[in-house]
A protein has these predicted regions:
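Small-residue-rich helix-loop
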Residues: 1-98
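Charged substrate- and nucleic-acid-binding regions of tRNA-handling and nucleotidyl-transfer enzymes
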Residues: 82-144
């Protein structure tokens, strides 16, 4: 555990372990090697501030704060039922109302939530992290 604290500035607690267990199968299927698996797992354990990859920083610099503030308001209505299927339904409706496609905003969401430009499926990540954590991570970029 001290290795992770010194190298990555994270402390693996029970919440981190729970999140890792829920997301590990998806991460394993997307990882080419053990190093990539470890890197793609860090966002489940990270506290603020998130470590942002150079590629993800490009997306974060271009974030349209208004869209993501509106998205958080809409997602907040599902806080007590923050499951993948419900998140997909809400996002789909939101995107239609805004005249957008998922591909228009997915990389921005991924960058703000994970600090990465590549990750497991975003709806799975959102469910595992939960609304409060998602809100904290997105707000740190749109307010900061």
């Amino acid at each position: 555990e001290s290795y992770y604290i010194s190298k990555y500035k994270i402390k693996i607690d029970e919440i981190s372990i729970k999140r890792l267990n829920l997301g590990l199968d998806d991460i394993k299927s997307r990882s080419r090697d053990l190093n990539q698996l470890a890197e793609m797992s860090l966002f489940y354990c990270s506290k603020f501030p998130l470590t942002i990859s150079k590629k993800a920083q490009k997306y974060i610099k271009k974030v349209d704060k208004t869209i993501f503030k509106d998205l958080l308001l809409v997602l907040g209505n599902t806080e007590n039922d923050f499951k993948k299927q419900k998140i997909e339904e809400i996002m789909s409706k939101f995107l239609i109302e805004k005249g957008l496609k998922l591909s228009d905003i997915i990389q921005y969401i991924r960058a703000m939530i994970t600090g990465l430009d590549v990750s497991p499926r975003i709806y799975d990540i959102m469910e595992i992290l939960g609304f409060k954590e998602i809100k904290k991570r997105i707000e740190s970029f749109i307010n900061g």
